[in-house]
């Protein structure tokens, strides 16, 4: 039986959240492919250019768009929430690669978690804040 030495696969991890979407992001040295839940990024994000540019924007800020493949497991929320969660996860993963990446990413706002979530409905109201129509008589 031969013993093979395997080269360790270098990957950098980052987790992003937005609304109810959670994205677990892996950056692997590659040529700039985006794979989300086993599908090519263009297919998963329905060929929407703004979603794709949001996902790639942290890499483009640092000029590394052709150096790393983005592999994502995204759950919850819709496409917008998932795309922005992926963006945060990519930015966090880039910070683990090199701490000098943190300043330009922070300056662009990629490391800030958007904390806005849907407000809960209250009893006695129709929605979170919408009250039933008031009738004086």
Curated annotation (Swiss-Prot):
Residue runs in coiled coils: none
Matching PANTHER family: RIBOSOMAL PROTEIN S9, SMALL RIBOSOMAL SUBUNIT PROTEIN US9M
SUPFAM superfamilies hit by this protein: Ribosomal protein S5 domain 2-like (SSF54211)
Domain of life of the source: Eukaryota
Molecular function per GO: RNA binding; structural constituent of ribosome
One GO CC annotation: cytosolic small ribosomal subunit
The protein, known as: Small ribosomal subunit protein uS9c
Family from the record: Belongs to the universal ribosomal protein uS9 family.
GO biological process: translation
Protein localization: Plastid, Chloroplast
Keyword Ribosomal protein found: yes
Main location: plastid
Pfam families per the UniProt record, alphabetical: Ribosomal_S9
Protein species of origin: Mesostigma viride (Green alga)
UniProt keywords, alphabetically: Chloroplast, Plastid, Ribonucleoprotein, Ribosomal protein
């Amino acid at each position: 039986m031969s013993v093979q030495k395997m080269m360790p696969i270098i990957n950098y991890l980052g987790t992003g959240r937005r609304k109810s979407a959670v994205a677990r992001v892996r950056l692997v040295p590659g040529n700039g492919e985006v794979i989300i839940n086993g599908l090519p990024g263009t297919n998963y994000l329905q060929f929407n250019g703004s979603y794709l540019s949001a996902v790639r924007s942290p890499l483009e800020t640092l000029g590394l768009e052709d150096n790393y493949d983005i592999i994502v497991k995204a759950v919850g929320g819709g496409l917008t929430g998932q795309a922005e969660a992926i963006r945060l996860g990519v930015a966090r993963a880039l910070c683990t690669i090199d701490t000098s990446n943190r300043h330009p990413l922070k300056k662009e706002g990629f490391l800030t978690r958007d904390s806005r979530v849907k407000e809960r409905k209250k009893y006695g109201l129709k929605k979170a804040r919408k009250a039933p129509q008031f009738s004086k008589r």
